[in-house]
Amino acid sequence: MFGGGHMKKLLLYYHTIKYLKFSQICYRICRRLQRRLYNPYIREAGTVPSVNMDTTYTIPELDLDPDYLGRFNPEELQQNIFTFLHLKKKMDIRNGWNDMSMPHLWRFNLHYFEYLYSIANACRLSKDEKYYEKYKEIIREWIKNNPIGKGDGWHPYTISMRLPNWICTYELLYDKIDKDLQFKEDILRSLYTQYRYLQRNVEKDIRGNHYLENLKALILGSIFFKKERLLQKYMNELDKQIKEQILEDGMHFELSPMYHNIALEALIKINFWTRQERYTDTIARMLCVTCSMAQSSRLPFFNDCGEGVGKSARVMMDTAQKYFYINAQYRTSFEAGGYYILPSGPYRCIIDAGKIGPEYLPGHGHCDALSYELSVNGELIIVNSGTYTYERGKWRDYFRSTRAHNTLTIDDTEQSECWESFRVARRIKDSEGCMENHDGIPVFRGSCLNYKEQRHARSIMWIRPDILLVVDRVFASEYRYTKSYIHIHPQYELIWTDHWEITKEKKRTADIVCINADSAKKYRGDEINGWYAPEFGLKCENDVLEIISHVPVSGYIINFSNQPIDTALWERIMDIVEKEKIKSIK
């Protein structure tokens, strides 16, 4: 009845759906029915309530941060030229809002309206009316050409992003808008319509960061439109979501540093808008994660993560300190989230030993268990590959794959079955990590089972202040080989002499010495491997070392010292490896 391809697809669906909460399935069915049977009959708001202009909505340190504003060129926007995800397009703002030739995430960014801050700020600083006229034109054309409930602009997530941006820039340009009565009526009517529409279309089927953004927008809308009863309702629901989504150590439960920062920004803003200290303790815990993980404001690339999304770690810390008197505390272990940091003088290794994500929401997860990133004096040397796109296809598949991270495959088996853009079928389990002490040396130990229930255990330690040892153990009744990957930052390259060297501008930075390896091969810009995506929509070639081994215990040394490894140190290293081998046999 079913061919092999159909059966495989059915199994993927089965192993994906079985992890969902029953409520998610019910809400998904209800949302589909609502879109067809109810949403088409939603009409524009009639009477618009008075709005609250006694509250400050814009946080200058966040919303007008120069680095953030620099993402949007107000002069290009004057010509209807929009740039997102490193894709620039001159757009027809009458008919181009749902241009299917552009990536889905690009269209979503278009509907977020974050670029309004750049236009509004240019208007305030220059006093040039052309910016106000462009501000009005873009909003009016959106209202005119995006019928209620149709297209990307009425997706609950785009409403959740756009509504705060319209309200905050409304405040920034209030002196002008208050005198422009027709436009004032137009924007307020649309805002109220979007607010009411979102109330009926929250993303309880997806949950996670989407639902958090829904609640943020509804809380702001309730403050703006003076809906006190609804404000309390959404605040109470947010309390429940914080208990679910923010782990004990402060990490957001989707385990993406980027989405963690987005959730942190949402709570900072809600705390600011409500003039309460309701979430100050939660913000402090979350800020501890951001402060500890960030390197020169760059977050580590675990799970879906990239630069140029949200605000920088520095801006978050400065804002929280100014308004809530929070000083972030640095930590090296985040047990609930599964992240661990091994510092050694100028060197810093950050490791992921966590799950792929919540069982019912792994959509932003990558196959990066037991992977790490390594830096020296804040400069990255060994990196994960990042996130290039959310569009399904070979690039989405590659950047989520095990081989795109500094970890190990067993017989080329992925840690988890990632498929489509945001789906995961069978996945890793029993992932765990801890920090131990080995003869006075801090050691990270972690392990996980891939979806075929083959166990990979890894130990990472600084055996000297400038020599890192990585030891891998495989627990599997039958397997042929392992492949371990080391991804080098594009500023560096791998060179083979009589061993592998990491170099920068032809000068040696470190040696890589393989342990129990049968072969090693370098990739760069290959179809299989050798790509790095620092931001969405931007990828470049980088060197990747693939180390193949046929024995249960293998590994490598990264030697930053100026001295080769002497006999005494090598014997000590092999003694450690032998002890790990005994553990694997046991």
Model-found features: residue ranges?
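Residues that flank catalytic or metal-binding motifs in active/ligand-binding sites
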Residues: 111, 214, 338, 368-370, ...
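Aromatic-lined, polymer-binding surfaces characteristic
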Residues: 104-283
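Acidic/polar, glycine-enriched structural segments that form the non-catalytic walls/loops
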Residues: 30, 34-37, 41-60, 126, ...
